[in-house]
């Protein structure tokens, strides 16, 4: 059984900053290399400023060409009535859901993009 690059990246994405730093140190020791340039360039700023985000906001940026399909997708995702969903879509950019987990946010984004919407996760 072989691990794909995508599986490795997914595993690293789920790690905390501390765990990533420990992984980098272990890789430096095992392979006899140094990641000093990469750490200095981006790691210092990222480590101090960015903590692992656990809650995300799903923002409808625009409805695109197929507004009816987007309204249906918004209704299904939010449980809003037809009038409320249409008002939300017409008022884009607008927050669809706030404080959701990453997996739910990604699934909602995929569903809405398949309907033709432009969606952002913040």
UniProtKB/Swiss-Prot annotation:
Recorded protein name is: Large ribosomal subunit protein bL12
Please give the biological process terms from Gene Ontology that the record holds: translation
Q: Which gene encodes it?
A: rplL
Its transmembrane ranges are: none
- A Gene Ontology molecular-function term? mRNA binding
Look up and give the organism this protein is from.
Vibrio vulnificus (strain YJ016)
Record's keyword terms, sorted: Ribonucleoprotein, Ribosomal protein
Protein family membership: Belongs to the bacterial ribosomal protein bL12 family.
Q: Name one Pfam family in it.
A: Ribosomal_L12_N
| Subunit | Homodimer. Part of the ribosomal stalk of the 50S ribosomal subunit. Forms a multimeric L10(L12)X complex, where L10 forms an elongated spine to which 2 to 4 L12 dimers bind in a sequential fashion. Binds GTP-bound translation factors.
> What is one GO cellular-component annotation here?
cytosolic large ribosomal subunit
List the lineage, top down.
Answer: Bacteria, Pseudomonadati, Pseudomonadota, Gammaproteobacteria, Vibrionales
